[in-house]
Amino acid sequence: MARLAPHTLLLALFVFLFGSCTAQNCTTNNLQVTYPAPVAADGWEYRLISTGLTAPRSIVFDSTGGLLVLDAGVGVRRLTLQDNGGTCLSVTANATLIADTALNHGLAISADGGTIYASTVNDVYAYTYNEQTNTVDPTTRRTVVTNMTNTDHVTRTLLLSSRLPNELLVSRGSAANEDPQARNVTSGHSQIRAYDISTLAATDPPFDFVAGTLIGWGLRDSVGVGENPTNGGIWSVENSVDDLTREGVDVHQDNPGEELNFHGILGNTANQGGNYGYPDCYALWSTAGFPDLGALEVGDQFASDNATAGVTDATCNTNFVDPRLVFQAHVSPLDIKFNTNGTTAYITFHGSSDIVSVAFGLNGQPTSPMDSTTAANNILTSPDLTQCPDDCFTPVGLTFDTIGRLFFSSDSTGEIFVLQQSADDGNGDG
């Protein structure tokens, strides 16, 4: 085995402990990760600001600057932050607002700050929130959406629209790797639906999940759902199928691609309610060695070996909605958030321990073509994927604060980080 030079060993140790280089000096926060530190791209820096959580998933700020965290298996926490500028933040208080071990992922807060929404596998709850006292009265809990229980994919992502603040979107995944019930729109499986919560009177029963406006179906597990602030476009990121074969040949290593899907604009039926193909059709990522490739290109849909009789590659590309972009197989995208001018979407890749950016144009669409394999640009990565998933950060939820810093959760490590663009080359302080 070749021996590394002393300076190489020192550099490797430095990256392990501190990331690609040192971030701004911060005397109020000396937290460090206990695994190989993530590496920030040029022009970015990050800092670990909270540890000791159980499994932090969705995160969102309240109007007074408190960071609300859906800590799966615990409930909803509120972190009070001391802000010394840049990435120099630290947590001065960690309070449990809602204690409910059934809460597992979804979290949203109303535009007026007075209502917190959180989800279990079966229900979406609304709680009255007092932002002045930073408290929730548990007796105010009300079920607003119900009847969502299924096995396998049990998270229920929540998004409150900024364009139409009374519209609550809920994403529900499949009950199996390839779920035959998802072929039936009345099953509610593998769908995103929207609900006008302003129409729910105090004495009304909750919405049944399948009663919501259909935003999209044939979506295996679209955990990440986001809204482009410039035009209100709704986007989701799809976790596609595992263990895929094509004409009996194992192609699962690089196919199918994970997906970025467009669902139109709330209040406008164009591009809304379409079927995206699951479980009959999947999107092509790698063409190398793909059986019966024919004229298929990256991003095209192809028929599953288990597809309904009569479904072919041709019908997959004419009868179903194609993804706008595809990503490497099995990166497991879990959230998508846009910057304020809608020029960039940020996406967490839970499976590959990355945070990436995707460029958007003034038309509200990605600037990359549908067949691109380079649309996702790494912002934060793990230095050694051979150590994953046991010894890596695993990003889940994203949220921006009022000055544009990007915060994210890492569920397997129980951590919260802050990430921002900097004037220096790539840096970080794990």
Curated annotation (Swiss-Prot):
Keyword DNA damage: no
Disulfide bonds: 281-316, 388-392
GO cellular component entries: extracellular region
Annotated localization: Secreted
pH dependence as annotated: Optimum pH is 4.5.
GO MF assignments: metal ion binding; oxidoreductase activity
Keyword RNA-binding included in the entry's annotation: no
Similarity remark: Belongs to the sugar dehydrogenase AA12 family.
Protein task: Pyrroloquinoline quinone (PPQ)-dependent oxidoreductase that catalyzes the oxidation of various sugars such as L-fucose.
Domain notes: In contrast to Coprinopsis cinerea PDH, the first AA12 family member which has been characterized, Hypocrea jecorina AA12 contains only the PQQ-dependent dehydrogenase domain (AA12 domain) which is not flanked by an N-terminal cytochrome domain (found in AA8 family enzymes) domain and a C-terminal CBM1 domain.
Descriptive protein name: Pyrroloquinoline quinone-dependent sugar dehydrogenase
Organism: Hypocrea jecorina (strain QM6a)
Gene of this entry: AA12
